[in-house]
Amino acid sequence: MTAVPPHHPTDSVTDRFLGHRELLFSVVYNMLGSVTDTEDALQDVWLAWSARHRKPDAEPVENARAYLVRIAVNQALARRAEMSRRQETYVGTWLPEPLTAADDHGAEGVERAEALSMALLVVLETLSPLERAVFVLHEAFGFAHPEIARILDRSPTAVRQLATRARRHVHARRPRHRPEADLHARVTERFAVAALGGDLRTLLELLAPEVTLWTDGGGKGPAVSLHPVHGRAAVAAVFMAVARALPAAGVDLRYRRVAGDPGALVFADGSPLAVVVVELTPEGDRISDVFSVTNPDKLTGIRPPAP
């Protein structure tokens, strides 16, 4: 969690930062898709915020929210370039780091209404950093274009152009639909049980014909393929093989929110083995995408199941 000094009720500088921390975390995470990099960015936001208030001649900040969001967005943009360089040498498919409810990153209060789905976060990876910033601020958090222009130090016209390009790009790759939450959770649970239990009949029932499996092991965790696997028969075969390869002692399956999605968490010997999220077809009756994160570096914040 972002380091801040011990909290005192009279410390208005700390209070004002903490009062906006959830918003800052959610904005930066949706821009980066990395919990670790988000925490690093928020640490630098706090350092800049506190350093400003240590100056004896500092002018008061009238709009702390706007001021902090601007710092946070600029920190995220700086880290975006570094992350892109890391991803160039990443082993296999890169997926966003799972942000789960009740994890160890102090993100329990992240504004879930604005948490983007795993599928949308994957699409946002194809935008330019500025397009992604504009899309996140406007579409997820409702910032007006003039306000975004001030945050990014761009003209309102330039921001509107970025917004149009980003929206067109996203909607071409991910048609806008949001499955009913209870249905999404039920399908996720049925799929997880079938996948780990080797239930071929249920897998074939749940998977859409053109389903795609995305697995992120980062060269460190189990990954069935370094590339996406396409097609119902191929994806079902993968999970049948996974079920046969599970440890004899079995695994512990739990369900938690993963950013904006219901998710399945797989534990072995008390340690996280995988986080799985499924995306449904627009009709909501089949699975169009399966996202599985097994890279242990991306699972460090996930708490083990209670005994």
Language model features with spans:
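Helical hydrophobic small-molecule/effector-binding pocket
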Residues: 196-207
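Short beta-strand edge/turn micro-motifs at domain boundaries
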Residues: 275-302, 307
